[in-house]
């Protein structure tokens, strides 16, 4: 039996490319999908409220919520943290609180999450983390 995958943040830069490659991926986000995508869509009202996922069947997550608009992010000192770290932290807390069994969470971000002073290449998930703005 194939694992069900959800993609959170489907309307940004990478989301549509993933969804076009695999119509079975369930899209989860605040904004509706473009009309050329046939993936099923689940709306969430906020990038910090994942309760609409409570009754969904999924084992894998592609997490794409974030922002790389450097002009806006540089003008608002805390916005990069809010857009690129809080949503992921909230989602991981949601998974823990609901005791959801997940095979993988793949996160794409514009922020460096690993400690740049301790990072070793190639980088894996066991590297020391130190997200910074």
Residue ranges and their predicted role:
Residues 2-23:
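N-terminal Rossmann NAD(P)H-binding glycine-rich loop of SDR-like oxidoreductase domains
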Residues 76-90, 129, 133:
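Glycine-rich NAD(P)-binding loop of the Rossmann-fold in SDR/ketoreductase-type enzymes
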Residues 8, 28, 61-65, 105-111:
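SDR active-site strand-loop-helix element
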Residues 44-83:
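NAD(P)H-binding glycine-rich loop region in Rossmannoid oxidoreductase-like domains
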Residues 89-130:
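Conserved Rossmann-fold NAD(P)-dependent oxidoreductase catalytic core, especially the SDR/UDP-sugar
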Residues 24-34:
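Conserved glycine-rich Rossmann-like NAD(P)H-binding loop of the short-chain dehydrogenase/reductase
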């Amino acid at each position: 039996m194939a694992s069900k995958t959800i993609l959170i943040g489907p309307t940004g830069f990478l989301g549509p490319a993933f969804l076009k490659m695999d119509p079975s991926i369930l899209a989860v986000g605040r904004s509706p999908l473009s009309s050329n995508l046939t993936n099923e869509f689940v709306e969430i009202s906020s990038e910090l409220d994942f309760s609409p996922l409570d009754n969904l069947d999924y084992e894998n997550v592609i997490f794409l919520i974030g922002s790389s608009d450097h002009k806006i992010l540089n003008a608002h000192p805390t916005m990069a943290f809010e857009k690129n770290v809080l949503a992921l932290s909230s989602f991981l807390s949601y998974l823990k609180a609901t005791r959801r069994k997940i095979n993988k969470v793949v996160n794409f971000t514009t922020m460096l999450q690993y400690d740049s002073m301790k990072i070793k290449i190639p980088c894996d998930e066991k590297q020391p983390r130190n997200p910074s703005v």
